[in-house]
Amino acid sequence: MRLGYDVIGDIHGHADKLKELLKRMGYARAGSGYRAPQGRQAVFLGDLIDRGPDQTRVLSIVRSMVDSGSARCILGNHEFNAIGYLTDNPGNPGEAYRPNRAETPKALKNREQHVEFLAQVGEGSGNHHGWAHWFRTLPVYLALGGRRVVHGGWDDGSVAAWQAAGWVDGAI
């Protein structure tokens, strides 16, 4: 049987809307996630976090679905930024790749964009680091049945650079 895909993008921490959507598409509650209908699989296009009131619940639902095989998930720019927010930049000691520690306009903007997620996971906590670690496992694209699934756009040169760096599965 050929698998059909339900493509879902930009949830941004809105768990109630996600749960409603999954139910309307025939997904059944299963543990902390949902089970796909026969012959279907959810494909989340990233941007699971930032903005919404229940970001950790969204992450729990999506991760449970990925772990059970009911879904696949790719990295969105908000998850990419969350990784950079925690990763020290050796070229700029005392700062992260996503600047947030200095009192500069860019660092203040980056903190503001990420403030809701940080409040919900506890900035710098084990929970925060754990989710960032999981984000690193997410591919930046998927090839599904002859189709490519990406969050924002496709660039052959960028994809080739990722593959040359050893990220052949698309994960960071």
Question: PLM features: residue spans?
Answer:
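N-terminal active-site segment of His-dependent metallophosphoesterases
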Residues: 1-61
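Active-site neighborhood of divalent metal-dependent phosphoester bond hydrolases
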Residues: 52-59, 64-172
